[in-house]
Amino acid sequence: DSIERRALFRAHGARICEFPITEEVAADARTANEAVVMGAPNVVRGGSHLGWASAAPLAERGLVNVLASDYFWPAMMEAAFIMAGRGVLDLPRAWALVSANPAEACGLQDRGRLEAGLRGDVVVVDEARRAPVAVFAEGRLAWLAAEAAGRMG
């Protein structure tokens, strides 16, 4: 809630700034190369339900680099599409807010990206419907939507 409080957390070793309520705190954390997390529902709703900082414009300026599910997990995928639709971030950069960047912030080096030798966790999305079609975990099919299963014969 303040740069001074952020400095205190930093002194204790905290390297993730969760839900900063002001732009100044987010900027301070990013200047210190810390991950800054805000809620994906904040993006979907068009702003904070508490009147605090708004996630989308901060993410567009690089001050927020992780979007978390917060209280509504479906908001993560929707937020990535909304961010891309705003025209400042392309879809890969917007998707990184809910995939590669959170993995990096948590030290999960083997996930969040599609590269040889990594886990191979993939969500296949119907972009027109903004809905998941299939999920692969560690390269293996873990879930398939009913309509996708029907198309496979």
Which residues make up each language-model segment?
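Histidine/acidic residue-rich metal-binding segments in metalloenzymes
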Residues: D1-V36, S48-L63
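His/Asp/Glu-enriched, well-ordered alpha-helical/loop segment
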Residues: A32-N42, G46-V125
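Conserved acidic residues
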Residues: R15-I16, N65, D121, V133
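C-terminal cap of metal-dependent C-N hydrolases
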Residues: L114-G153
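Fold-independent oxyanion-binding glycine-rich loops
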Residues: D1, F19-P20, G39-P41, Y71, ...
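Short phosphate-engaging motifs
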Residues: V25, A75-M76, A131
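Phenylalanine-focused residue identity feature
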Residues: F9, F19, Y71-F72, F81, ...
